[in-house]
Amino acid sequence: MVSTTTFLMLTSLATLTSARSHLTVTIGSNCTLKGPQGGHVFWWRIYDNGWFTKPCDQPGRFFCNGRDLTIINVTANDKGFYYGTDYKSSLDYNIIVLPSTTPAPRTTTFSSSSVANNTISNPTFAALLKRTVNNSTTSHTTISTSTISIIAAVTIGISILVFTITYYACCYRKDKHKGDPLLRFDI
């Protein structure tokens, strides 16, 4: 039973961490973590020992605007896991901090704009931006990864229970069939 519980916990943890976004930042830079598109986002920092804090309660180190979290002047102590939720959806981040002498990994930016930025007037650009933000909200029909991992863990646990009960029922017969074959007098 202990091995079943351990397997169940490891499976659910593997499912949870597979959906986590990994970000690599250098010391001294600023890092912005985007929150879910819903309402006001609450941010948590989770330490390796299980402790957690609210980074938005530390105004000198972090900046929160209601949705996004910005880590100001990243240090080696800022590495770890950050969790943002609006209690309808959530996002996980794993921050990996590199020394400032290590070059940051290359990032490629793609642009599909066919109009030069200086040809669009400010009101038109603001209207397009507002329409884009309104159209990019997440659907309420999507299922979060933590929900999927919980469902997977429960399904695995129930299947292990069914297997154990079936094994017990098939391998252990009633007492009248358990007799020693040398003491039977059936000829």
Swiss-Prot record:
Question: Which InterPro entries does the UniProt record give?
Answer: Adeno_E3_CR1, Adeno_E3_CR2
- Keyword entries, A-Z: Early protein, Glycoprotein
- Asked if the record carries the keyword Glycoprotein, the reply is yes
Q: Which Pfam families match?
A: Adeno_E3_CR1, Adeno_E3_CR2
Q: Which residues are glycosylated?
A: N30, N73, N117, N134, N135
- Signal sequence residues: none
User: Family, per the entry?
Assistant: Belongs to the adenoviridae E3_20 family.
Name-wise, this protein is: Early E3 20.6 kDa glycoprotein
Q: Which organism is it from?
A: Human adenovirus B serotype 11 (strain Slobiski) (HAdV-11)
Q: What is the lineage of its organism?
A: Viruses, Varidnaviria, Bamfordvirae, Preplasmiviricota, Tectiliviricetes
